[in-house]
Swiss-Prot record:
The keyword Nucleotide-binding does not apply. The chain crosses the membrane at residues 14-30, 49-65, 73-90, 148-166. Belongs to the DsbB family. The lineage of its organism: Bacteria, Pseudomonadati, Pseudomonadota, Gammaproteobacteria, Oceanospirillales. Required for disulfide bond formation in some periplasmic proteins. Acts by oxidizing the DsbA protein. It comes from Chromohalobacter salexigens (strain ATCC BAA-138 / DSM 3043 / CIP 106854 / NCIMB 13768 / 1H11). Its main location: membrane. Pfam families: DsbB. Residues 1-13, 66-72, 167-172 are cytoplasmic. This is Disulfide bond formation protein B. Signal peptide: none annotated.
Amino acid sequence: MIIRLAGMSVRQGCLLGLLMCALMMGVALVLQYVYGLTPCPLCIGQRIAVLLAAFVFAIGALHNPAGNLGRGLYAGLAALASVLGLAVAARHVWLQSLPPENVPSCGPGLDYMMEVLPLWDVLSRVLAGSGECAEIHGSLLGMSIPQWTLLGFAVLLLIPLGMLAGIVIRRR
């Protein structure tokens, strides 16, 4: 699969990445607005990572650089956003796997923290997760929503890795 992605143009790779981001955000919004699942702080962090990757992919698709420098830049930034989302999703899955007595207690709401605390403190508390992040709200095919999101970020990461592989293959 990586080799097939390596043969794509920057625009094709970025459009594929953008499509994957749209799919991930679409599912998140359906879960929120159709099924009434309120996103926890880690879910919001994952959404931010998807939006960052989507932004990079959109700019890359519009720019469509011909050289390896542009290809590497967009692929590297998209990979960074994907790894960020992967890390937040992994943290979320880990929190859900904890025994109930080890789950962190619920803290103040995100809106309140944004009003009262400096941004860095809010980010560190959000990424630490809380009790609400450990709740499992159903599953599909035996996997929780954060597990599916983790899988989504892993698939998303393949796209910029394929774009980076294209640089290596072209240099041979």
